[in-house]
Amino acid sequence: MMPRLILASTSAYRRQLLSRLQLEFDTGRPEVDEQPQSGEAPSALASRLAAEKAAAVAVRLPGAWVIGSDQVADLDGQALGKPGTRAQAQAQLTAMSGRTVRFHTAVSLIGPERELHALDLTEVQLRALTPAEIERYLDAEPALDCAGSFKCEGLGISLFDAIRSQDPTALVGLPLIALARLLREAGFHLP
């Protein structure tokens, strides 16, 4: 019998991605403070938050394996949060126009007496965007809940010149290649 698997997230995007691995799982809401610590690098922030999310749910469900994931976008080493407002999304997209944005996507798998962690780096080269293009994009797909102010799985892909990544699912928020490796290491049966 396979151990119980929990996704420590309420994100529909992550739930949809995890379902691609064809494992039964439940979800749990992680209650963590997502504020960066002073001087914390974007990759360290993503790794810490992924681990904290998994741990926050694992403590409530002893014996289960819990997946936590987090993504932090950075432009020139400066973390970009979820915009939350249209004005902030406009500002982020304007700042990223014609530039490369790095997305640090971390995943943690916490189970009985064991923790496994991975980190994926994806680089997105945005094309030069006009203010009108930014407005049209935000009218069509206001990605206010997404790091970087776009949804790569939707119309946001039209903002890109290129993506460099070992794992295309990482940009959506859950690096399945790394997660599948961690799950196999933990004893889950995957091809």
Curated annotation (Swiss-Prot):
GO terms for biological process: nucleotide metabolic process. It is an enzyme of class 3 (hydrolase). It holds the Pfam family Maf. CDD domains: Maf. It comes from the Bacteria. One of its GO terms (cellular component) is cytoplasm. It is found in: Cytoplasm. Belongs to the Maf family. YceF subfamily. This is 7-methyl-GTP pyrophosphatase. It comes from Xanthomonas oryzae pv. oryzae (strain KACC10331 / KXO85).
